[in-house]
Curated annotation (Swiss-Prot):
Pfam families in the record: Pept_tRNA_hydro
GO MF, one annotated term: peptidyl-tRNA hydrolase activity
PROSITE patterns: PEPT_TRNA_HYDROL_1, PEPT_TRNA_HYDROL_2
Subunit structure: Monomer.
Active-site residue numbers: H19
UniProt source species: Pediococcus pentosaceus (strain ATCC 25745 / CCUG 21536 / LMG 10740 / 183-1w)
Chief location: cytoplasm
HAMAP family for this protein: Pept_tRNA_hydro_bact
Protein name: Peptidyl-tRNA hydrolase
Entry EC no(s): 3.1.1.29
Biological function: Hydrolyzes ribosome-free peptidyl-tRNAs (with 1 or more amino acids incorporated), which drop off the ribosome during protein synthesis, or as a result of ribosome stalling. Catalyzes the release of premature peptidyl moieties from peptidyl-tRNA molecules trapped in stalled 50S ribosomal subunits, and thus maintains levels of free tRNAs and 50S ribosomes.
Annotated site (Discriminates between blocked and unblocked aminoacyl-tRNA): N9
Gene Ontology CC entries for this record: cytoplasm
InterPro entries: Pept_tRNA_hydro, Pept_tRNA_hydro_CS, Pept_tRNA_hydro_sf
Name of encoding gene: pth
């Protein structure tokens, strides 16, 4: 089984905000596979589909961003998901809007959702797909990440989401993560 985790904050007030990038990636992947009914389990919204007979679990933690690990770890345990079979999609302020980057490990880079997952899984070594949201120029970091994309950013962001979805779909079938990084980075 593979597990794709999209990070974000639950609630209408956070819809389409930069910090909900992971949710938007998972939602787009779900849409592509005609999935529209997530259910609640272990502080998360989950759904699944199959690729070549293997189950792929989509996860959107409902714990709010800063406590995402509290939802992720119990699902990994319940479904017996190995760290190599999990990937996390999330926003990255240190990359231009829409740019994606895949990594197998690394620090949280100041991202509280990733900090929480690292704390709950006990390692920095897990797969990630980061989608650039750019860095604020005038507003505070909190206001920026909890704000919506500016009109001139939307097209680049949507391309980034589509590229992240393509990378995640490839991830479900490619054994060698380095090949995937070479293709998308």
């Amino acid at each position: 089984m593979k597990m794709i985790v999209g990070l974000g904050n639950i609630g209408k007030e956070y819809d389409k905000t930069r910090h909900n990038t992971g949710f938007m990636v998972v939602d787009e992947l779900a849409k592509k596979h005609d999935i529209n009914n997530f259910k609640v389990q272990s502080d998360a919204l989950i759904a699944d589909f199959r690729v070549n007979g293997e189950k792929v679990l989509l996860v959107k933690p409902t714990t709010y961003m800063n406590d995402s690990g509290r939802a992720v770890r119990p699902l990994m345990d319940y479904y017996d998901v190995d760290l190599n079979d999990m990937i996390v999609a999330y926003d990255d302020m240190d990359m231009p809007v829409g740019k994606i980057r895949l990594r197998q490990k690394g620090s949280a880079g100041g991202h509280n959702g990733i900090k929480s997952i690292i704390a709950h899984v006990g390692t920095q070594s897990f797969n990630r797909v980061r989608v650039g949201i750019d860095h604020p120029t005038k507003e505070s970091v909190v206001d920026y990440v909890l704000g919506k994309f500016r009109k001139e950013q939307i097209t680049d962001f949507e391309i980034g989401v589509q590229n992240a979805v393509a990378a995640l779909e490839d991830w479900t079938t490619i054994e060698n993560f380095s090949q995937l990084m070479n293709k998308y980075n």
